[in-house]
Amino acid sequence: MADLAKLVDDLSALTVLEAAELSKLLEEKWGVSAAAPVAVAAVAAGAAAPAAEEQTEFDVILTDAGEKKINVIKEVRAITGLGLKEAKDLVEAAPKSVKDGVSKDEAEKIKKVLEEAGAKVQVK
């Protein structure tokens, strides 16, 4: 049991990058994929979705960068995790989707942040 407790402590001390690397190594060693259970859950959620009438996933669309394009690029980078060039390309290619399949609350937060930066945004 002491070995298991030490293992738990060691795993808890890992950084996110180290945990991701560990996951890859275990997948290779055991010949499995960590993505399989997620796909099953997504299929189950997709099957239940037609029963619900209310939309649960929203897309945030940047329709115009406005006058303060630099501020909008900064916020797009923060929201999406894109690099500077990719965020700039996305902003300049408006109308363009910033984030897809997010909850209503998250979509509204993203819309508010982008509008405060000077952009025009649509939530679909």
Curated annotation (Swiss-Prot):
GO terms for cellular component: cytosolic large ribosomal subunit. It comes from the Bacteria. Keywords: Ribonucleoprotein, Ribosomal protein. GO terms for molecular function: mRNA binding; structural constituent of ribosome. Belongs to the bacterial ribosomal protein bL12 family. Forms part of the ribosomal stalk which helps the ribosome interact with GTP-bound translation factors. Is thus essential for accurate translation. PANTHER family: 39S RIBOSOMAL PROTEIN L12 (PTHR45987), LARGE RIBOSOMAL SUBUNIT PROTEIN BL12M (PTHR45987:SF4). This is Large ribosomal subunit protein bL12. It comes from Paramagnetospirillum magneticum (strain ATCC 700264 / AMB-1). The lineage of its organism: Bacteria, Pseudomonadati, Pseudomonadota, Alphaproteobacteria, Rhodospirillales.
